A protein has these predicted regions:
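Helix-adjacent hinge/juxtasegments
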Residues: 54, 58-105
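Residue-level signal for inorganic ion chemistry
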Residues: 18, 52, 82, 126, ...
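Generic beta-sheet signal
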Residues: 2-6, 32, 79-88, 119-123
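Charged, low-complexity C-terminal accessory regions
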Residues: 1-10, 24, 29-35, 159-183
């Protein structure tokens, strides 16, 4: 069982990197299941969903979840799971649960399931917190919950990558704690 995390900004190439890795594993016989999240609420989002559909290899199985927790039961044990993307999953959960105090425990439960599930897992997530402080409470809650989940996943992951301009920065071997410089 391996856990691999791809984090980065919008349109950085996270999904492409995850799909490329999953495709390589599928050539070795792995069954690939991609869990995607989001509501086609407007034309831009519909176009985005369709673009992702056409980008995925035909032999990938896809779970298009419209509820934050419903997709978990549909994931076969032992399959290579690609979660694309954790930020969209959190947004879906925040739409379901209007109370921030109810969002965090449910999201923590989903993240815990991702970490513990049998089978290899690739997680695509959004890097948050490098911009201005969001003006609205919901934006701050989203940033805080996702930022914490990203840190937990990266610490648990066998490999973690920051994707910038289509390039991968391997975070796995980077220090997790600061140290004083040597004298």
């Amino acid at each position: 069982m391996s856990l691999i995390v791809f984090t980065g900004g919008a349109r950085s190439g996270k999904s492409a990197a995850a799909q490329e890795l999953a495709a390589a594993r599928s050539r070795d016989g792995a069954r690939v299941v991609v869990a995607v999240f989001g509501q086609p609420i407007d034309q831009e989002m519909q176009d985005r969903i369709e673009r992702h559909r056409t980008d995925r290899p035909d032999h990938f199985e896809t779970i298009e979840a419209t509820e934050a927790s419903s997709w978990v039961a549909a994931v076969p044990d032992g399959a290579l799971l690609v979660v694309d993307c954790l930020g969209t999953l959190l947004g879906l959960l925040m739409d379901e649960e209007q109370e921030p105090d109810r969002v965090r425990p449910r999201f923590d439960e989903l993240v815990g399931w991702i970490i513990r599930r049998p089978g290899d897992t690739i997680v695509v997530t959004n890097e948050v917190g490098e911009g201005v402080v969001p003006a609205y409470e919901s934006g701050r809650v989203f940033r805080d919950i996702l930022g914490r989940a990203n840190r937990i996943l990266a610490n648990e992951a066998d490999c973690a990558y920051l994707v910038v301009c289509g390039r991968l920065v391997d975070l796995t071997s980077m220090p997790r704690h600061a140290a004083w410089p040597s004298d």
